[in-house]
Amino acid sequence: MLQTQLQLQLQGVSIFHQLGLLIGLSLILSITWTAYTILSPYLRVKGKRIFNDRGRSELLWTGARKRFQAGARDLFKSAFAQNPDAFYIMTDTDVELILNSKYAAEVRNDKRFDIGKYNEDMFHGTIAGFEMFEDDHVLERVFVETVRNKLTRAIGKFVEPMSQEAADGLQKQWTDNTEWHALPLHQSILRTISQQSSRVFQGFPLCRNPDWLRITVNHTVTFFEAAESLKVWPHPLRPLAAKFLPLCRKLRAEAEEARGIIAPVLKERRARRTQQVEQSIEKNTKNEKKEDEDEDQNEDEETPGDMIEWAEQTANGAIYDPALLQMKVSLASIHTTSDLVSQAIFNLCSRPELVDDLRKEVISVIGQQGWVKTAIYQLKLMDSVLKETQRLKPISIGTMVRTTTSPVTFTDGLQVPPNTRTLVSCHNMWTDAVHANAAEFDGYRFLKLRQKPGQENWTQLVSTSNNHLGFGHGMHACPGRFFAATTAKVLLAHVVLKYDLKLLDDQKPDIIEHGAAQYANVWCGIGVRRRKEEIDLACPMATV
């Protein structure tokens, strides 16, 4: 009996001892992690000043991150006034080195500046649901090569189909109502561009499948919201947290739904391709070379020309996720193009004389040439309007995001340590030293510059330079910018020819700033009314 009581007492002591050890260990780990979180940014900048530092009363970096989210552009301006070349700053995610755009020429093709590593760290590329940003993933190779080598070369064949989708989308979203009526601009443009893009990415009829269009629009929003929800967790706990956080679960569910929609299409495509190969082998004979050539040509004509097929060709048997690729294409193109077009329309609403000139250009160019690639190039005023829109409001105040893989020393002596996140500022696009009256919107700005000898190339929307970084610069410049420019011009042509535009009296389309990102106002609507277009855009050359 006495022995039993003694054993129970010892067990009680042992339990309390273990509990105490557990609490003590948890406390030590918590203190260690907090100390690391506080000190890590200072250690990585090696004694250099960090702008947007912790305040005197701030223990953690939470306040600094919130300040960056609320006023990044002002923080950049203040920091550049003191350090014109480069400075470290605490962003809403981590400390980064912000570079003057003069360094863009050196960063642009330097492989020590790694975009894949940056994106993997920023967007949790190793965690389930975020795989589209995993570094060195076959998906990234298939994505980039397909866009550069297939999509860009095929744009000319899709100008007219994109016009058809623009007409269908606008008729559904903006209607044919000839009376003034208000509508949500950004959402209507987003849906129309999603339909245009899907015509090229997935072909007909998938481009008009409401479930597919819903996913392509919503998945990007879900992705970035899920990424933000995960950033508040310590790095070691993020894979576990992602299993339970509602937005991360929603992200994975949308990807599964996308796979369910695209799987039958892909299965049918692969079966047809296998059948074509088998038929070709059966018909192939040594003395009928000409027939073989004709057969190959017929196969090419029968093969659907869209991103689904091009990705299959590019992968060449490599294992990848076709649905995830389509989501990545949509993420990279639909929302950014919609943002550019929405902001351009806001700019046009208060400039009726510019709208009139754009109408004249569309009537002249499309009316004489129809929906062909060369006609899109000849829409030079429209190109200028879009480039000026992007100059004043790029999608981010910093671009060319990278992480250094080894030490870098620029030609002027500026040193960048390895594993440093870098970003090139776009602020030169807003300075009078580069552009006269830089703060003012001038839709004719780049058209006038383009007419000067030697200025033809850099003044085009798709051209990048140290002083215009809207699409990035160098080997990692946006590979889909040629497609984005074509999509935007086709849609704007329909907008200006078919509708009158105006701002609503009670709404002001102020830019939405969130950290380094800048968005066209998603809550601001506009007034539109249907007008009788001067040419029928369904068959423009027949009505001139």
UniProtKB/Swiss-Prot annotation:
It is an enzyme of class 1 (oxidoreductase). GO terms for cellular component: membrane. It comes from Aspergillus versicolor. Heme binds at C478. GO terms for molecular function: heme binding; iron ion binding; monooxygenase activity; oxidoreductase activity, acting on paired donors, with incorporation or reduction of molecular oxygen. Pathway: Secondary metabolite biosynthesis; terpenoid biosynthesis. GO terms for biological process: secondary metabolic process. Its EC number is 1.-.-.-. Residues 273-305 are annotated as: Disordered. Residues 280-290 have a biased composition (Basic and acidic residues). Belongs to the cytochrome P450 family. Residues 291-304 have a biased composition (Acidic residues). The chain crosses the membrane at residues 19-39. This is Cytochrome P450 monooxygenase cle2. Its main location: membrane. It is found in: Membrane. Keywords: Heme, Iron, Membrane, Metal-binding, Monooxygenase, Oxidoreductase, Transmembrane, Transmembrane helix.
